[in-house]
A protein has these predicted regions:
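Structural motif
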Residues: 189-205, 210-217, 299-305
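Structured interaction patches on ligand/partner-binding surfaces of diverse proteins
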Residues: 268-296
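Short, acidic Ser/Thr/Gly-rich low-complexity loop/linker segments typical of extracellular
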Residues: 214-251
Length: 356
C-alpha cells in the first residue's frame, strides 16, 4: 500500500445516482463526512499549473483575403525552433521594417500572459533611464492567439529584447519566454554641397537607397550614356526606396541592413549623383565622400541644357505669390526666380549627371 500524502484540497465530492450503492463513508475532516447508500465520485477542482506556450508565431505584414497578390504577410523562423520547454530565442532580421507581430498560443487557455517590451514616448522614441543609456521597459497584458504589434529598436540602437511571462491558472507557476530581435547593419555616410550655392550655405538634399536587384528589373545601367537625355530619375521614382534627408550642413549617416544598394543623391532642380551596386556587410562603413550637386537640371533628364534654360525663362522674375512660380527653379531658395538662379544654371550649362 502506498502511504505517501496526497493533496485533495482541490477536490470535491459529488453524489452519483446512476451507479449501484456502496455504503462507503468518507471522512473529509473531523466534523464533516459523507455517508450515502448511493455511490459518489471525486470532482477535481485543483487549479492548473500549466504555464506553457504551445507556439509563438512571429510575423510581419498583412493578409489581403480579397486580393491575395497584395498580401505582405510573412512568418519568421525562430532560433532555435520553438518548443514549449525552450525559453530563450533569437531572430536575426535582415529587412528594413519597423515592426513585428507576436502571436503567442497558450497550452492552457486558463493561463494569462504579459509582454515586457522597450518603453516609448508619445512620439514613438525609446525612453531611457536617467543615465541616458539603459532602455526602460513596460509591461502590458496580451491575449491568447491574438497578434500584438511591437515596434523594433532602430538600426544601430541595440537589440530589441522581448519577454512573454505566462502565469498558470494557480497564479503562482510562471514561465518567461524571451525573444531577442537582432538587426545587423552597416553605415553609409558622406556629404554634399550645392554648386554654385556654397556661399549661400544651402546644403540640404535627400539620399535615396534602392535595392540593386530591384533596380536591375527596371534599369539596365550598361545602356545609360553620359550626356544623353533619359528618364532614369523618373524610373527610379517608381521603385521603393529608403529616403533620408541630409543634415543642415549636407552631411549624412544612414544605418542600413546588409545588402547591395544603388544610391541616389537627389535635390529638386539639381543634377542627380548616383552610385550603383554598393555592397554593405554587417559592420561595414561606406563613406562616399563629399559630392557636388549641380543646379539646373530642372526636368531631371540627366543633362543641364536648353530645355532647362527654357523652363527657367518661362518662370523668370516670378516669386511665391505668382501663379507660375516653380520652386524647383528657385535654386537658392529665396522665394524668387531671378538673376541668381539664371546665373547658377548658366554656370553649370552642359554639365551631365554622374554615375559611379
Amino acid at each position: 500500500m502506498i502511504s505517501d500524502d496526497f493533496d485533495i484540497s482541490g477536490f470535491s465530492l459529488k453524489e452519483d445516482e446512476l451507479v449501484p450503492t456502496t455504503g462507503i463513508k468518507i471522512n473529509l475532516n473531523v466534523k464533516d463526512s459523507i455517508e450515502n447508500k448511493s455511490a459518489f465520485r471525486f470532482v477535481d477542482a485543483t487549479a492548473s499549473k500549466n504555464a506553457n506556450l504551445d507556439n509563438l508565431i512571429v510575423s510581419s505584414g498583412t493578409t489581403d483575403e480579397e486580393n491575395p497578390d497584395n498580401s505582405t504577410y510573412k512568418e519568421y523562423e525562430l532560433n532555435p525552433k520553438f518548443d514549449k520547454d525552450t525559453l530563450n530565442y533569437e531572430l536575426e532580421l535582415l529587412e528594413n521594417i519597423d515592426e513585428l507581430n507576436l502571436k503567442p498560443i497558450l497550452s492552457d487557455t486558463k493561463s494569462s500572459m504579459k509582454l515586457k517590451k522597450p518603453k516609448r514616448d508619445e512620439d514613438g522614441n525609446l525612453v531611457y533611464e536617467s543615465d541616458g543609456v539603459i532602455v526602460e521597459y513596460e509591461e502590458l497584458d496580451i491575449q491568447n492567439n491574438v497578434s500584438t504589434t511591437v515596434k523594433l529598436n532602430e538600426l544601430g540602437k541595440g537589440d530589441t529584447n522581448l519577454t512573454i511571462t505566462v502565469t498558470a491558472e494557480d497564479g503562482k507557476t510562471e514561465k518567461n519566454y524571451t525573444l531577442v530581435v537582432k538587426r545587423p547593419y552597416g553605415v553609409i555616410r558622406g556629404s554634399i554641397f550645392l554648386k554654385p550655392m556654397e556661399s549661400k550655405k544651402i546644403y540640404k538634399a535627400t539620399v535615396r537607397l534602392y535595392k540593386s536587384d530591384e533596380v536591375k528589373n527596371v534599369i539596365d545601367w550598361s545602356t545609360v550614356k553620359s550626356g544623353k537625355r533619359d528618364s532614369i530619375h523618373q524610373q527610379l521614382e517608381k521603385i521603393t526606396s529608403l529616403d533620408s534627408d541630409t543634415n543642415d550642413d549636407g552631411t549624412f549617416e544612414i544605418y542600413v541592413t546588409p545588402g547591395t544598394y544603388d544610391i541616389l543623391l537627389d535635390r529638386e532642380g539639381y543634377l542627380d549623383h548616383i552610385f550603383i551596386s554598393r555592397t554593405i556587410n554587417n559592420g561595414d562603413v561606406l563613406d562616399v565622400g563629399e559630392k557636388e550637386l549641380y543646379a539646373g537640371d530642372v526636368n531631371k533628364d540627366g543633362v543641364i541644357q536648353l530645355l532647362d534654360l527654357s523652363m527657367l525663362y518661362s518662370a523668370y522674375q516670378t516669386d511665391t505669390t505668382s501663379a507660375n512660380y516653380d520652386k524647383k527653379i528657385d535654386f537658392n531658395d529665396d522665394g524668387r526666380i531671378q538673376l541668381l538662379d539664371l546665373s547658377a544654371l548658366k554656370a553649370n550649362y552642359e554639365v551631365n549627371r554622374i554615375i559611379e
